[in-house]
Amino acid sequence: MPAPDDCREILERTWGALLPPGSRCGLALYPDHWNVGDAAIWWATRRLLTDLDVTVAYACDPWSYDPRALGASLPDGPILLLGGGNCGDVYPREHACRLRILADFPERRIIQLPQSIWFRTPAAIATMAEVTGRHRDFVLLVRDHASLDVARAQLPGVTAILCPDSMLALGPLARLAPATVPVLALWRQDSESRGPLPALPAGWVARDWTLAGGPLPATEAAQLSLASRRFLERVGAPPAWPPRPPAADEAARLSRRRIAWRHLPWLWDQLAEDRARRGLRILSQGRVVITDRLHAHLLCLLAGIPHVVCDTANGKVFAHRDAWLGRHGIRSASSAEEAVEQAASLLAALDAAGEAAVAR
């Protein structure tokens, strides 16, 4: 099994074969929400594209996608769809935009960056199969063997390639703050969770890193998020879904949007990096971390934070582990209760042997 550093080399090699140096591309599905994992994927994607000497000529999120603006900014060249875990019917907004881009550009090469595929209903995968079957050049990078099997068996016309998660392109990281609690349990509160945590020992902290349902914090990241929306509105790209009908002054609106796409990637890069670093700061609070989030696990791995990882309801965490990382010192638990037991043992080992020796 490759180590994390080897995974970065695989990403460079796989993406480099699809995107020659000096090429221009579009990059769709910017994640303008508070899931740290998706922000880290965008951050890693932009860094890797820069390293490969690939220029992003157009960027959009699901609200601001406009085929006319994309065509004007990028008359030819591939369109990239951000990687992650939203290829399926669990996250309809992102997936609907993915299908629309495939339908709008049936002759253009479209590259779906590394994804896990998860459909809950046969009708939903049949809809995607209908769209991919009409497309001439759709390259689908998948993060695990189960997704590869689905792509090859049920999505006609797709070139499916196994590839690690994009976030591993970040390479080695460091803790952003000293640990302040013995164990931090960063646990999902959504449909991908396999269940709640049990009662934790005194002093341990449980939380998630999304802000769904809560107010935005008064931070630079929140200000940037609001600024990005206001910027879209000023250039005639209001964040509406489904997209609004074309304006009467179509030529002027497209001109404003072409200017916008030259600046939006920079703005979104700052926001994505800030959100990803926020997640790493949260994880840095624990001497030991328990998590069922794939990207919390990967951030801990890259930053050398001792942790115990559990799987999600759709199996994507362990599927990625088994495809790319094997064991490599990864402590895995089959249940939240087992994760708590392992974390307690790991904490005792840190106390007995010293953190540096155990982390090695």
Give the location of each predicted region:
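Active-site anion-handling motifs in enzyme catalytic cores
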Residues: 1-360
